[in-house]
Amino acid sequence: MLLLALALGAARAQQTEFLPELDAHLELNDRSRIFLQAKDDREGGDPTQFTFGPSLLLYRKPLLRLKHVLVFDLDSTKSRPVVIETGYRIITAPDAAITNRLIDAVTFHYPLVSGFLMTDRNRADLDWQNRDLTWRYRNKLTVERTVGIHGYHFAPYAAAEPFYESQYGKWASTDLYAGVSLPFLKRVDFEAYYEHENDTGRKPNRQKNYVGVRMQIYFSRLQRAQGKQTAR
């Protein structure tokens, strides 16, 4: 919480934009889930735009050490050592043609000492707008730890994500994050974060700051099926 407060204070001297996001997750079984994402998106130097679309996540059985670290986390995929994602996004922006994006990602979760978790997401975006085709690679490293106060558990985190952009032929942007995940009831998680972006793709270099709020809702067909079996 202190890290997030300091980051927000540092951003006051510069213009700060607000980024809302809503994600709905549906666990299909113990090895897959789908989710639908709707968000204002400025990642990797992108202009003002709205992103919407689904993803499919595939994974194997949870790792016992990860389950112990994440016992209070609503996102069960964090307990899986490897998660594969494939998805599609439609992207709209003012005065611009629609962009279509294909997403492929592999995410690794590593339990660290003292209850810390490190997440390493490797993602490739393939974009096409009219007849123009571009791609980018992004690698997001996140470190988080669940903290409990008077029976309530939340997870502060810090993250860094560099972007390699094909249109510039170089590492063109780096996003830094500080945030906190706040579970609410049994199915909802609110995430508040500060994001600082260093965009070096075009000259002059640009520094941008954002404050984001992400609401994630979790549903599970697996739990529903188990509940019906118990009722019988």
Region annotations inferred by a language model:
Residues M1-Q15, Y218-R232:
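Cleavable N-terminal export/targeting peptides
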Residues A11-A13, D40-G45, T92-A97, D127-D132, ...:
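Outer-membrane beta-barrel domain signature
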Residues Q14-F18, D30-I34, L70, S76-I84, ...:
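Outer-envelope beta-barrel architecture signal
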Residues Q14-V69, D75-P81:
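Start-of-domain marker
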Residues T16-F18, D46-F52, I98-L102, L133-Y137, ...:
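Residues that define the transmembrane beta-barrel architecture of outer-membrane proteins
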Residues D23, G53-L57, V69-D73, A105-T107, ...:
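Outer-membrane beta-barrel architecture
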Residues R60-L63, Y110-R202, V211-Q223, T230-R232:
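Outer-membrane beta-barrel transmembrane domain signature
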Residues T92-V113, L117-M118:
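Ordered, amphipathic secondary-structure segments that act as subunit-interaction surfaces
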